[in-house]
């Protein structure tokens, strides 16, 4: 025997244990048959433990009586509102989905517990706390995903879900018990009463509307974000020169053909596709270095209709033992190439006419390495002697008068040697560096080589002067020694 509970969270199928709890199964079946549970709220949700239902009004209503059994409902006798519950020793709360009647102790006999219409469904395993407090009469066999939804519901501090979860309808799949006297099954599910409607917090429909509205708002926000991102990327490509303008769209009369055989040529494709209309261009893209086919091509038709007809009829057609794929072109590289070539040609023509700052554009200026005032060259590029002739002579020639330079006097009538010696070496070096900076790199390299060669020559001259001076000193020493020896020889003769 089974019962189907249609809830706002989904459907749950319960198998009844009529052999272990016949009276409780009969009470539950007959209450489902008279639609007593319709619109009953699910409340007291304890995560991973249990939830409770079966009261048509629920604990939030002040008019609720906690529910009653089928016999009390039919007779109206308060004494039959509840009945003694039977606890079978073999039935324990060990598995998730165990269904049991909620009970309360008898006012006069605490060992006897009374059941009415409310029942409990466990949401976790090993909920043995309920043993002896709730009488088991069934188990859930289908709808465990619904139990997960109920377990994850948002609840307040008393365990009541913020969004109503209610039993919408009950369907009896098998009923072995005869109907009690006076019971009549309604022909249709009755609408909820005013007392039941007063207990509504947030209906499922309102939640769905809110969820759908939030989903639509999120989708709209995502669409706008993608549009802004695409516009920004297009603007970036336009600034980089890869697109003629940001709003450029791929042409509608160009087909993209791929998966070609490497031996297929432009003429072959043009001949095959020309039956759909006039072809303006047909190009198989090839490698720039090797010239080999990259096995895809672009075909440009004169009108859009011919392009669409070729697309609908030539996809997956066999050409040169290869089944090709045809699609509309999404490339704008050809438009960009045409735009770039036209722009460059306009700039070149404007530059030839002398218009614009540079390249035909007023805002551009040709880059210059040096300023105009820095390229003034000296008229006299000849080198001048730094040392006088007397500086190149030996130390023993210092008593001779200085030799004047035969060239025109630069220092205002003074000796050239004196004028050069009065100038500091650092000043000469700074002037040399300034002169080298104003000249080109090749002249600087040549002058550097000349200076190195001159430095080596002067080093050799100094070495020779040093050896020459040493020879003079040795010669003077030998002459003095010879005179002393001759003097001693004369003394001995006397």
Swiss-Prot record:
Residues 206-240 form a coiled coil. Residues 176-196, 391-494 are annotated as: Disordered. It holds the Pfam family RRM_1. Its main location: nucleus. Gene3D superfamilies: 3.30.70.330, Cyclophilin-like (2.40.100.10). Residues 1-172 form the PPIase cyclophilin-type domain. It is found in: Nucleus. It is an enzyme of class 5 (isomerase). One of its GO terms (cellular component) is nucleus. Keywords: Coiled coil, Isomerase, Nucleus, RNA-binding, Rotamase. Residues 391-418, 425-494 have a biased composition (Basic and acidic residues). Its EC number is 5.2.1.8. Residues 253-331 form the RRM domain. It catalyses: [protein]-peptidylproline (omega=180) = [protein]-peptidylproline (omega=0). One of its GO terms (molecular function) is RNA binding. PPIases accelerate the folding of proteins. It catalyzes the cis-trans isomerization of proline imidic peptide bonds in oligopeptides. Belongs to the cyclophilin-type PPIase family. PPIL4 subfamily. This is Peptidyl-prolyl cis-trans isomerase-like 4.
